[in-house]
Amino acid sequence: NKNVRLHLADRLHQTLPLYSNLGTVGVYVYAKDFDIPGRSATVTAEAQVRNEYAEPKTFSYEVTVAETDGKVLQRFKGGTATIAAGETRTVSASATLSNLNFWSWGYGYLYDVTTALKVDGRPVDAVVTRTGFRKLEFGHGIFKLNGRTLHLRGYAQRSTDEWPAVGQCVPPWLSDLSNALQIESGGNLVRWM
């Protein structure tokens, strides 16, 4: 069995992520300008917005970064835009966030980033992206995660046929078991094939 999700959206909406047959890229959240000791970074949220109305629409773009328990860390705005009928456009908002907990090996700290479109102050579309923020560096034969050198040891795992008779329908508990076996053996990296 596979999980199925039905997405219902206003005709002014943020597109679904990276579907080549739909020509969409969705929402992309990333961080840069890290200050690891100071626990801050600049967070950017970009969203591809599509207007399927027959007339232009003016909207504001707002971002909320929250803990997974709902506690809001920061809200910031990307301004107001007018999008023509049938147009698809990318909008963006950035802010420097402080008191961040960075995602790290053995400490998978996550945030819920909500990107919202508002027309006349009324929300018409919102997308929640669960993500973590971390600084990666590759150079001189060294890998660093949040400024700390990390020796990588891992596995090459195929996305299918790893468990006989299951195929692509891997339930979450079986994925958790695979991950636990890798960690118990000292692995900290999975290369998907």
Regions found by a protein language model. Name each.
Residues N1-M193:
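Secreted/periplasmic carbohydrate-active enzymes, especially glycoside hydrolases
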